[in-house]
């Protein structure tokens, strides 16, 4: 519960900082990208680039998280299979003795 409250507080702090920065940066700048050129307000450009960075970070994190989850599931299956084999071997050994 504390983790969620802390996350909400951090999110609100980031939003407040973004609003403050956006309110103070209203100048128009020219943004050149590979295909074209556009004019943006500095605050809008910062918000767009921040959002793209956030989305890219989440996608990269999700990729590695899913990769680790799949590896964890495979290892759990392997442990279960080996546990069954050990139990089977000890059962057959006990029957022989």
From Swiss-Prot:
Keywords: Cell inner membrane, Cell membrane, Coiled coil, Membrane, Transmembrane, Transmembrane helix. The keyword Cell membrane applies. One of its GO terms (biological process) is lipopolysaccharide metabolic process. The keyword Membrane applies. It is a multi-pass membrane protein. Signal peptide: none annotated. Involved in the assembly of lipopolysaccharide (LPS). Belongs to the LapA family. This is Probable lipopolysaccharide assembly protein A. The lineage of its organism: Bacteria, Pseudomonadati, Pseudomonadota, Gammaproteobacteria, Pasteurellales.
């Amino acid at each position: 519960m504390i983790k969620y409250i802390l996350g909400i507080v951090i999110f609100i702090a980031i939003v407040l900082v973004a609003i403050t920065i956006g309110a103070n940066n209203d100048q128009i700048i020219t943004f050149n990208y590979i295909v074209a050129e556009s004019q943006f307000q500095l605050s809008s450009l910062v918000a767009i680039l921040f959002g793209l960075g956030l989305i890219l970070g989440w996608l990269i994190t999700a990729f590695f998280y899913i990769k680790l989850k799949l590896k964890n599931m495979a290892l759990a299956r392997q442990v279960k299979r080996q546990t069954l084999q050990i139990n089977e071997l000890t059962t057959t050994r006990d029957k022989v003795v």
